[in-house]
Amino acid sequence: MKKVIATIFFIPALVLIGTGKASMRGSFTLENLISLESKAVDVPVELVYAVILTESSGNHLAKSEADCRGLMQVSEEVWNIFMKGKRWNLAYNPEENVRCGIRYLGDLYKMYGSWEKVLRHYHGGDPNSKRAVTNRYVKKVLKRAGMMSGDRRWVNRKEL
């Protein structure tokens, strides 16, 4: 239980400190943005933090070999769909990056209706992928989301 509680508070703090966005109480924070954007498209906040932790470990300057960028490791193709008219170099901006990533997750959920399929697609582009690396990714994200929410339904899915 202590581990769950520590995780609930640690992950948002890690993201905020890692991005330099930790701020005084009452002012707008990345945490507020994640909460607002998540609610707008019905994406669980815990899932967003779990994706951020898994994709970039909270490093807003992270860049993959495939040129995916920022906290949520969005691709240029995804960026151009969800952030129309905004320059690709803004993908390193934490606020813009999470806006894009959350919108993408919400759009994928509308298509698939399953967080497992959403994460499979988010990771490798194929909602039905059975690749071992994709299976590990999905399990890791769902486990982290479950640890943050304390909700066991995120963990130990039979279809994984």
Locate predicted features.
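Bacterial N-terminal signal peptides
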Residues: T7-V15
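Short amphipathic alpha-helical "recognition" segments used for binding
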Residues: A6-T7, N59
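Compositionally biased, intrinsically disordered low-complexity regions
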Residues: T7, A22-S23
